[in-house]
């Protein structure tokens, strides 16, 4: 937790997610940034850009700085629900390409991967182990239960398109029409009888694998690495994974807008980001963090932002989400309610 709000007159309400991700941010970023900047923070969980949009619409904004996936952030920005970033206050001059926009500043690079029970299918890279989205869909070659995303369309359609055999560089072109979006959803519909659990959060992804409740699952690489540390028999591949970033947005009309912008500037500095890989295997967005981190070569090579992994992945296209997310989400929710 940040410094108690009683110490300072103002406190920035920072909203992230729970589980190992929120703990990693507290340990690497928030606690020290609050202490060093003198800006108190109130930490809340349950971050959601849908909630941000509702707060902005109702004129009752209570959050100041909200963590979000890049696609949700782009959709909220397109809806006019976010403040423009003041780049005089938030220095992104050393950030990796495509890890910030005018409304969202990247905090970490992560990957949406598919993971599996290694007792059932073998260690990653071993003969016969799954290695592609086509394998995730192939219930004859890899019989067993699946788990897929339930409450959001971010990262849900692209795997289905790649499972159809569309090359990664053509995925967003395929999804640029309603027909393409519907075909992707039909592909997920095909798998639905084998999906025994739909997950709702990163904490749930980790728990499902710790409990060996499902055999194969989509989710975020860092959650699976932390589950493995906790004893889960889990492995994954970066092949065809979606390279994405989480970022911070400031809701339009945030009660402590200026202070939130200052805190965002502080937390984006390399000295905080350099600590993140020790707590979760997500890569810093600030290039300087890689120069000053004391992380081992082995740990750095496990990050989605490492050059040896980047080429295997599909970079998430933020513009596609800004234009198509609303329709894609509506159609995906229809599928889930069938």
Give the location of each predicted region.
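Early extracytoplasmic/lumenal segment of secretory-pathway proteins
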Residues: 10-76, 206
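Paired acidic/hydrophobic, glycine-rich loop segments that form the ligand-binding mouth/hinge
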Residues: 63-67, 198, 215-220, 235
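Mature extracytoplasmic/periplasmic domains
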Residues: 251-312
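Conserved C-terminal helix/tail region of periplasmic/extracytoplasmic solute-binding proteins
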Residues: 308-338
């Amino acid at each position: 937790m940040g410094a108690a709000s009683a110490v300072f007159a103002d406190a920035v309400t920072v909203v992230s997610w729970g589980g190992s991700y929120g703990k990693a941010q507290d340990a690497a970023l928030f606690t020290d940034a609050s202490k060093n900047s003198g800006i108190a923070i109130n930490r809340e969980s349950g971050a959601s850009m849908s909630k941000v949009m509702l707060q902005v619409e109702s004129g009752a904004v209570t959050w100041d700085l909200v963590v979000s996936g890049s696609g949700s952030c782009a959709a909220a920005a397109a809806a006019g629900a976010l403040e423009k970033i003041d780049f005089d206050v938030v220095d992104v001059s050393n950030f990796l390409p495509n890890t910030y926009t005018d409304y969202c500043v990247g905090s970490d690079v992560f990957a949406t991967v598919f993971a599996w029970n290694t007792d059932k299918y073998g260690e990653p890279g071993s003969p016969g182990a799954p290695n592609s989205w086509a394998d995730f869909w192939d219930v004859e070659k890899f019989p067993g239960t699946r788990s897929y995303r339930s409450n959001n369309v971010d990262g849900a359609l692209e795997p289905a398109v790649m499972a159809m055999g569309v090359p990664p560089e053509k995925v967003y072109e395929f999804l640029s029409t309603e027909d393409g979006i519907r075909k992707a959803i039909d592909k997920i519909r095909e798998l639905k009888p084998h999906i025994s659990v739909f997950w709702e959060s990163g904490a749930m992804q980790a728990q499902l694998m710790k409990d060996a409740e499902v055999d194969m699952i989509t989710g975020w690489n860092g959650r699976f690495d932390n589950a493995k540390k906790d004893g889960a028999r889990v492995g994954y591949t970066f092949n065809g994974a979606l390279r994405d970033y989480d970022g911070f947005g400031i809701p339009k009309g945030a009660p402590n807008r200026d202070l939130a912008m200052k805190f965002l500037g502080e937390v984006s500095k390399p000295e905080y980001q350099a600590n993140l890989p020790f707590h979760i295997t997500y890569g810093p967005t600030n290039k300087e963090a890689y120069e000053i981190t004391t992380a081992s070569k082995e740990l750095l090579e496990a990050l989605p932002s490492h050059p040896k992994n980047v080429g295997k992945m599909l970079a998430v296209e933020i513009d596609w989400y800004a234009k198509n997310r609303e329709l894609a989400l509506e159609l995906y929710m229809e599928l889930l309610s069938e």
